[in-house]
UniProtKB/Swiss-Prot annotation:
Post-translational modification comment from the UniProt entry: Phosphorylated.
Enzyme nomenclature, EC number: 5.6.2.4
SUPFAM superfamilies in the record: Origin of replication-binding domain, RBD-like (SSF55464), P-loop containing nucleoside triphosphate hydrolases (SSF52540)
Protein name, as recorded: Replication protein E1
Domain of life: Viruses
PROSITE patterns in the cross-refs: SF3_HELICASE_1
Lineage summary: Viruses, Monodnaviria, Shotokuvirae, Cossaviricota, Papovaviricetes
């Protein structure tokens, strides 16, 4: 073997290079404490002294990280914008009408131009694809994650791929269970129900613990109008529920709103009183627009107004923190939740009804029934009247008793007292001058008229009949009717003269009037009623009653026939006080009377000319006014001392 190549030791100058100086310590130089002076230098500290890796500038790393963050932020905003767009869309939201979503899935724009419905087969085929479509909210993220796990780790049948294990298979199974119960799937199942109404009613009872029929009464027609409505809505999105309370305030006077959550989404129960009456169709359209749900997901009926249980439910729910209540509580809730109405069932008292009718001057049966029924909200006796099965009998009895009391009161009063009694029920803004001017306008001496009018009111025999004659449209009937109305008199008509009872109203009046007497009427008066015109007592036949003897009240007769020109009625001349109205009744350019003849002016007329009519008052009335006690038919309560 040849010798190793290289320089020979000891030849030339190579021997000088092998000399190595060993320095023990140099003066004035401090050795670092980190260095061990006794350790041999083996060269291990020079390992990886040179870095052969790729050098990347620091600025480039920061720029790359910033770019990644910007791209992630942009992607997040794009996804959020897409979700916002699809959230309110009636074609994508599972809380909306999914039938329209099926029609528009292939091409929304083309579907919007269709003039008729598509084939039912295509709709059924699209149900499966609709269930797996991302709706933009809910469990869509879980569904996407499930697909990623299946693609990366194995097949849907549970076989594992590379790096897979039992934990991943378990996660896939859980995601599959969640994915089959998404909000979209649940609403589709709701639409597939054969009896949707029964399903909604069952879900309502499951959530609220009572039947929907316990709170409402049914309207057969969708066009029946009502101000109070109970609305139950299913499948409402939570974002709509947050702002619904504010949106509905503008349309309602009172709202009672409850929100619950279930597998279908948010469920609304609302009692609402609108500002005006609405029917079910109008309410349904408004709720569909505000809640973004179809009409078949709504239950709309009016509330039970006479149910104590329903009223207590709304009252108890309104004071809890589960409800949002705005506005004034309806009166039907207040009426049935007050303690005295809940624990004390008031019995009907006829005397209270009669006293009310007497105080309000109601004598007709129809007026009594209508007005008293309207008091049921504030009067417990009226409420008991409505609950009774004998309302017609009570109304008839009340009217009879009220007329008896009024008739007895009138007969006990003299003419001056009656005029004062009627004046108390009339306003004080009248003027007596139009009546005086109208009398003078007809060419009648006012003093002569007042002399005859005084005897007429005092019912002096042979002076108690006032006859007004003249051409048509001269104001005769207007003048007489206005006076009869003020004094609450009665009117008789000659058309009923063939009846035996046509004079019966004269038995219950302080003044009477026979309007437009024709020649046959004058002949009848001359033949049968001379003593009636005299003001003497006469016999009058009454229906279902025995004959009665009455004194005819002051009687006003208007006629276009002047009996002074006919000699056949000469026996009536001394029994009447006749005045002629020759001039037409004056009207202004607007068709209103120039001389107003109303109750206020007649009151002022009597007050002005009271002394001229020679009405005498008793000393007690002059000093103390009216001393008569107010009529009272309701029995009082006796206060017993202890």
């Amino acid at each position: 073997m040849a010798d190793d190549t290289g320089t020979e030791e000891g030849l030339g100058c190579s021997g000088w290079f092998s000399v190595e100086a060993i320095v023990e310590r140099t003066t004035e130089n401090t050795i670092s404490d980190d260095e061990d002076e006794n350790v041999e230098d083996s060269g291990l500290d020079l390992v990886d002294f040179v870095d052969d890796s790729r050098i990347i500038p620091t600025n480039q790393l920061k720029a790359q990280a910033l770019l990644n963050r910007q791209q992630a932020h942009a992607d997040k905003e794009a996804v959020q914008a897409l979700k916002r767009k699809l959230l309110g869309s009636p074609y994508e939201s599972p809380a909306s009408d999914l039938q329209e979503s099926i029609n528009k899935e292939l091409s929304p724009r083309l579907g919007g131009l269709q003039l008729c419905r598509g084939s039912q087969g295509a709709k059924r085929r699209l149900f499966q694809s609709l269930e797996n479509r991302d709706s933009g909210y809910g469990y869509s993220e879980v569904e996407i994650r499930q697909e990623q796990v299946e693609n990366g780790h194995g097949a849907p049948d549970g076989s594992m791929g590379n790096g897979g294990g039992m934990g991943s298979v378990h996660g896939v199974q859980e995601n599959q269970e969640i994915g089959t119960n998404t909000p979209t799937t649940r609403v589709v199942e709701l639409l597939k129900c054969k009896n949707l109404q029964a399903t909604l009613l069952g879900k309502f009872k499951e959530l609220f613990g009572l039947s929907f029929g316990d709170l409402v009464r049914q309207f057969k027609s969708d066009k029946s109008s009502c101000t109070d409505w109970v609305v139950a809505a299913f499948g409402v999105h939570h974002s709509i529920a947050e702002g619904f309370n504010t949106l509905i305030k503008a349309e309602a006077l009172y709202t009672h709103i409850q929100w619950l959550t279930c597998t279908w989404g948010m469920v609304l129960l609302m009692l609402i009183r609108f500002k005006c009456g609405k029917n079910r169709t109008t309410v349904s359209k408004g709720m569909c627009k505000l809640l973004n749900i179809p009409a078949n997901q709504l239950l709309i009926e009016p509330p039970r107004l006479q149910s104590v249980a329903a009223a207590i439910y709304w009252f108890r729910a309104g004071i809890s923190n589960a409800s949002v209540v705005t506005g004034e509580t309806p009166e039907w809730i207040q009426r049935q939740t007050i303690v005295e109405h809940c624990f004390a069932d008031t019995q009907f008292n006829l005397t209270e009804m009669v006293q009310w009718a007497y105080d309000n001057d109601l004598t007709e049966d129809s007026d009594i029934a209508y007005e008293y029924a309207q008091r049921a909200d504030t009067d417990s006796n009226a409420a008991a009247f409505l609950k009774s099965n004998c309302q017609a009998k009570y109304v008839k009895d009340c009217g009879i008793m009220c007329r008896h009391y009024k008739k007895a009161q009138m007969k006990r009063m003299s003419m001056p007292q009656w005029i004062k009694h009627r004046s108390e029920r009339t306003g004080d803004n009248g003027d007596w001058r139009p009546i005086v001017k109208f009398i003078r306008y007809q060419g009648i001496d006012f003093l002569t008229f007042m002399s005859a009018f005084k005897k007429f009111l005092h019912n002096i025999p042979k002076k108690s009949c006032l006859v007004l004659i003249g051409p048509p449209n001269t104001g005769k009937s207007q003048f007489g009717m206005s006076l009869v109305k003020f004094l609450a008199g009665t009117v008789i008509s000659f058309v009923n003269s063939h009846s035996h009872f046509w004079l019966q109203p004269l038995d219950s009046a302080k003044i009477a009037m026979l309007d437009d007497a024709t020649p046959p009427c004058w002949t009848y008066l001359d033949t049968y009623l001379r003593n009636l015109l005299d003001g003497n007592p006469c016999s009058i036949d009454r229906k279902h009653k025995a004959l009665t003897v009455v004194k005819c009240p002051p009687l006003i007769i208007t006629s276009n026939t002047d009996i002074r020109t006919e000699d056949r009625w000469k026996y009536l001349y001394s029994r009447i006080s006749l005045f002629e109205f020759p001039n037409p009744f004056p009207l202004d350019k607007n068709g209103n009377p120039v001389y107003v003849l109303n109750d206020e002016n007649w009151k002022s007329f009597f007050q002005r000319l009271w002394s001229s009519l020679e009405f005498q008052e008793s000393e007690d009335e002059e000093e103390n006014g009216d001393t008569g006690q107010t009529f009272r038919c309701v029995p009082g309560t006796v206060v017993r001392t202890v």
